[in-house]
């Protein structure tokens, strides 16, 4: 069979196009300028958005970058390792034709990586079971499953009043100088799945894992996280990504995406329940602003790019559950509010995308309360689907509502006391003040290494609510009140047994032992 010239041309054209698609490997020496973290290249053929490029410096050093923008035959590349030392005339750029992918494997658990996904724990390279695009695969909205069932953190203020459902995304709003890093480390140590019975709570199940990504942290904070995870054994089920403050700012843009790609592999291919903690998202937003300024884009609020809402959603929306997969991704991003301003663009836009917030309060911190979580501005929008009979306990919802109501009333009573004095307060106001003090000192206050199950937290909540007579607990249904109020009283009476009675009981037991001898 003889092919015509036209047919041969078509076959050759198709082969060339396929060759470019598979592995073009085009090299250029056409760098025309460097602007901040960006490199501008001229006369580029077939550039692609998000394509990975390798830049070879005159000294032989190779750095990775990503095509950020294409204007005709001009390509703008952001360099992950920074642009210092790049010579415009002597730097060679290679276009790979591929997007940024990360090698993933179950062996990533127990390992520590830098912000670009390279191991920094003196261990071997990860033996890849798959290579995944760090931007993730789009999830069909119809295939998403509503987040249900609870993830326990071991922190009473979260588990009892702001319960987190598997597949939920709920940020922690903090500020400079507050112990959000300690809270994050405590959650990593204690987090697990909740069993529906009081006497069985296995927080370290084989199908529960944690992916932790830190962006822009200093050396002291990075050392704290590594030591804490290693000493408490939580590193075995954790994959840790660390982008330090002295690392290139641009690297912070890919660090959370590397972490989430790892989480997606563990959740959807190995069917684990994955808790992903990202800190600090403010550093990520500042990196976005730096790139936007280098590209000379029109700035939005406070200099941040106008597309920051869309960009943040590409991170937060990767949490969830998918039909046909038993795993889930639960996200807890942590951000520091500049000047404690909750209306700042970063917390403001984050609040629009996520499903609630956990608020770390400076006033509680100044009182010496740890963790200083203020439950009044905190909210978990998916809490109702994570609690109740069969998941935690049937009294959970009513107890949470009653604690919120009494704590708010206690705050009002404290404000009134500051104006009129304690003598002018009613008996109910004095009860509210007593509840306020005990709530903050015994319920919210918790040791950094104190792990409370959700059932222990609920029992402690009932012991606080017993300050009030039954008729004043109007947020709890009569049936729940009859079942749990007296039970809480009986438990408290047993704990407050007379010490003289206990000592006489011990003497009686000792005399019985002597008579037996």
From Swiss-Prot:
Q: Where is the composition biased (Basic and acidic residues)?
A: 500-511
Cross-link Glycyl lysine isopeptide (Lys-Gly) (interchain with G-Cter in ubiquitin), sequence positions: 14, 508
Keyword field: ATP-binding, Hydrogen ion transport, Ion transport, Isopeptide bond, Membrane, Nucleotide-binding, Phosphoprotein, Transport, Ubl conjugation, Vacuole
Q: Where is this region: Disordered?
A: 487-517
Q: Which Pfam families match?
A: ATP-synt_ab (PF00006), ATP-synt_ab_N (PF02874), ATP-synt_VA_C (PF22919)
Domain of life from the UniProt record: Eukaryota
Q: Name one GO molecular function term.
A: proton-transporting ATPase activity, rotational mechanism
Where is this chain's protein located in or outside the cell? Vacuole membrane
Write down the InterPro entries for this protein, in alphabetical order: ATP-synt_VA_C, ATPase_a/bsu_AS, ATPase_F1/V1/A1_a/bsu_N, ATPase_F1/V1/A1_a/bsu_nucl-bd, ATPase_V1-cplx_bsu, P-loop_NTPase, V-ATPase_su_B/beta
User: Phosphoserine occurs at which residues?
Assistant: 4, 137, 503-504, 511, 515
- What are the BP-aspect GO terms? ATP metabolic process; endosomal lumen acidification; Golgi lumen acidification; intracellular calcium ion homeostasis; pexophagy; proteasome storage granule assembly; proton transmembrane transport; transmembrane transport
What is the membrane topology noted in the UniProt record heading this document? Peripheral membrane protein
Where, in this chain's numbering, is ATP bound?
Answer: 381
> Anything further noted?
Present with 131000 molecules/cell in log phase SD medium.
Could you tell me which HAMAP family the record lists for this protein? ATP_synth_B_arch
**Could you tell me what this protein does?**
Non-catalytic subunit of the V1 complex of vacuolar(H+)-ATPase (V-ATPase), a multisubunit enzyme composed of a peripheral complex (V1) that hydrolyzes ATP and a membrane integral complex (V0) that translocates protons. V-ATPase is responsible for acidifying and maintaining the pH of intracellular compartments.
Query: Subunit structure of this entry?
Result: V-ATPase is a heteromultimeric enzyme composed of a peripheral catalytic V1 complex (components A to H) attached to an integral membrane V0 proton pore complex (components: a, c, c', c'', d, e, f and VOA1). Interacts with RAV1 and RAV2 components of the RAVE complex, which are essential for the stability and assembly of V-ATPase.
List, alphabetically, the PANTHER family matched: V-TYPE PROTON ATPASE SUBUNIT B
What protein is this chain from?
V-type proton ATPase subunit B
Q: Which organism is it from?
A: Saccharomyces cerevisiae (strain ATCC 204508 / S288c) (Baker's yeast)
Q: Which gene encodes it?
A: VMA2
């Amino acid at each position: 069979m003889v092919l015509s010239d036209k047919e041969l041309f078509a076959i050759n054209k198709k082969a060339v196009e396929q060759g470019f698609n598979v592995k073009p490997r085009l090299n250029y020496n056409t760098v025309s300028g460097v602007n901040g973290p960006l490199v501008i290249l001229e006369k580029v053929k077939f550039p692609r958005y998000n394509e990975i490029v390798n830049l070879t410096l005159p000294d032989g050093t190779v750095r990775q970058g990503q095509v950020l923008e294409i204007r005709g035959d001009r390509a703008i590349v952001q360099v992950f390792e920074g642009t210092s030392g790049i010579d415009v005339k002597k730097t060679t750029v290679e276009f790979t034709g591929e997007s940024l992918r990360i090698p993933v494997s179950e062996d990533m658990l127990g390992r520590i990586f830098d912000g670009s996904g390279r191991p920094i724990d003196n261990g071997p390279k990860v033996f890849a079971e798959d290579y995944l695009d760090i931007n993730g695969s789009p999830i069909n909205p119809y295939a998403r499953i509503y987040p249900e069932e609870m993830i326990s953190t071991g922190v009473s203020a979260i588990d009892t009043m702001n319960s987190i459902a598997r597949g939920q995304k709920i940020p922690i709003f903090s500020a400079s100088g507050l112990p959000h890093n300690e809270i994050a480390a405590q959650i990593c140590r204690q987090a697990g799945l909740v069993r529906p019975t009081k006497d069985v709570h296995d927080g370290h199940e084989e199908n529960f894992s944690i992916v932790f990504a830190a962006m822009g942290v200093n050396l002291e904070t990075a050392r704290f996280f590594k030591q804490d995870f290693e000493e408490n054994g939580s590193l075995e089920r954790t994959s840790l990504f660390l982008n330090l403050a002295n690392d290139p700012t641009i690297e912070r843009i890919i660090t959370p995406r590397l972490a989430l790609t790892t989480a997606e592999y563990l959740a959807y291919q190995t069917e684990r329940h994955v808790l992903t903690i990202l800190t600090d998202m403010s550093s990520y937003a500042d990196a976005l602003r730096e790139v936007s300024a280098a590209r000379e884009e029109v700035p939005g609020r406070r200099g941040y790019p106008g597309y920051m809402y869309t960009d943040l959603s590409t991170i937060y929306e990767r949490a969830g559950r998918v039909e046909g997969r038993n795993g889930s991704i639960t996200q807890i991003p942590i951000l520091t509010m500049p000047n404690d301003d909750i209306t700042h663009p970063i917390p403001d836009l984050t609040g629009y995308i996520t499903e609630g917030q956990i608020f770390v309060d400076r006033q509680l911190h100044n009182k010496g309360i740890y963790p200083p979580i203020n439950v009044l501005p905190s909210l978990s929008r998916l809490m109702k689907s994570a609690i109740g009979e069969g998941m935690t306990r049937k009294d959970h919802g009513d107890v949470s509502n009653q604690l919120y109501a009494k704590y708010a009333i206690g705050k009002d009573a404290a404000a009134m006391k500051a104006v009129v004095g304690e003598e002018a307060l009613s008996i109910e106001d004095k009860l509210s003040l007593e509840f306020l003090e005990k709530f903050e000192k015994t319920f919210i206050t918790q040791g950094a290494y104190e792990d409370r199950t959700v059932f222990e937290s609920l029992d402690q909540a009932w012991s606080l609510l017993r300050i009030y007579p039954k008729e004043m607990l109007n947020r709890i249904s009569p049936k729940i009140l009859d079942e749990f109020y007296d039970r809480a009283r009986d438990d408290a009476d047993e704990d407050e047994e007379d010490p003289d009675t206990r000592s006489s009981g011990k003497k009686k037991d000792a005399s019985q032992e002597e008579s037996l001898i």
